[in-house]
């Protein structure tokens, strides 16, 4: 499934209205914030249909999956939106992550905890905002510049850059840092970013990670960032997205895709947008001087023109 899908569900007392943009949407929040009410409404409509007290408007069918029989329930659902309420422990398992990778559904998961087995975006973590009879989803982490904390008004001048892995993105920033007599380090996996920052509490660090899959780590890392003035987060969709956004490919189709990625990225084929942008960049540069591989950076990306075009996408970050 791909595209943006609007869901309007409600009774005569309360109505929720929201849009889903990706295959994974996380709803967070404390009790009494309406999360369970939303899932209850979907369940009631699923059981009672149009004759029941809940009305549901959506271009896709909506289902609730729960309990020990979740696998069998999922087997019978295609091209639909699946809601899962908190308390269903199976959402934390690798078994669940594997099972939903091969489906063409969108998933809306209610949880108070991070779900490290799932590569969900920082942009698709929401709380519920209710005003009178109306409820909607409000982004938990939103920054116009993809820079966190949001209160950052001046340009960020780090002494060190930390990337989440040691692939091409790290190799690019390592080379850039060397030019500016700065350090670049890798956390060797997004789940290690938090412990790295705790161990390096006195250093002025800019963390660069793939926003498209950093959702599970965001809560605890952002808490650190908000309590320490020497930390900042920069979360592009991915390093490949940065390259595609830089314009160095001069490709009209890429420009169109970047405008509305939801219209092009099928969740059945790409579990996260990061994977899609990697595949797109690899395909678009194959056989050219910009030939891209994820493991080893092509030196063409370190030429002044390419490098400066990529860095220019990083608003509010100054490395010189």
Each predicted region: which residue ranges?
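Acidic, divalent-metal-binding catalytic cores of TOPRIM
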Residues: 88-89, 123-320
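N-terminal pre-Walker A segment at the start of P-loop NTPase domains
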Residues: 1-16, 136-140
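The conserved Walker
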Residues: 31
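Conserved P-loop NTPase "ATPase switch" module shared by AAA+ and STAND
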Residues: 69-94
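Post-Walker A alpha-helix
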Residues: 38-40
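Conserved lysine of the Walker
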Residues: 35
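Structural recognition of the conserved hydrophobic beta-strand(s) that form the central parallel beta-sheet
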Residues: 83-85, 104-114
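Post-Walker A helix-loop "phosphate-sensing" segment adjacent to the P-loop in P-loop NTPases
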Residues: 44-55
């Amino acid at each position: 499934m791909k595209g943006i899908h609007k869901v309007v569900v409600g009774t005569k007392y309360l109505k929720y209205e929201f849009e889903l943009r990706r295959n994974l949407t996380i709803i967070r929040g404390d009790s009494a914030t309406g999360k369970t009410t939303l899932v209850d409404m979907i369940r009631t409509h699923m059981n009672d249909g149009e004759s029941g007290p809940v009305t549901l408007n959506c271009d896709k069918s909506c289902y609730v999956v729960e309990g020990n029989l979740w696998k069998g329930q999922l087997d019978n659902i295609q091209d639909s939106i699946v809601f899962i309420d908190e308390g269903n422990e199976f959402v934390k398992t690798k078994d669940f992550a594997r099972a939903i990778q091969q489906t063409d559904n969108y998933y809306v998961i209610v949880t108070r905890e991070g779900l490290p087995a799932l590569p969900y975006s920082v942009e698709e973590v929401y709380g519920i905002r209710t005003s009178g009879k109306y409820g909607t989803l409000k982004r938990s982490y939103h920054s116009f510049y993809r820079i966190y904390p949001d209160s950052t008004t001046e340009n960020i001048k780090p002494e060190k850059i930390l990337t989440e892995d040691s692939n091409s993105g790290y190799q690019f920033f390592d080379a850039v840092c060397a030019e500016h007599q700065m350090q670049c380090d890798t956390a060797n996996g997004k789940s290690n970013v938090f412990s790295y920052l705790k161990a390096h509490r006195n250093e002025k660090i800019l963390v660069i990670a793939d926003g498209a899959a950093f959702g599970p780590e965001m809560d605890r890392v952002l808490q650190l960032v908000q309590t320490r003035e020497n930390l900042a987060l920069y979360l592009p969709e991915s390093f490949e997205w940065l390259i595609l956004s830089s314009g160095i490919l001069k490709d009209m189709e890429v420009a169109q895709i970047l405008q509305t990625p939801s219209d092009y990225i099928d969740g059945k084929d790409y579990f996260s947008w990061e994977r899609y942008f990697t595949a797109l960049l690899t395909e678009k540069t194959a056989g050219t001087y910009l030939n891209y591989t994820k493991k080893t950076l092509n030196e063409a990306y370190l030429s002044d023109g390419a490098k400066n075009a990529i860095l220019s996408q990083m608003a509010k970050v100054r490395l010189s």
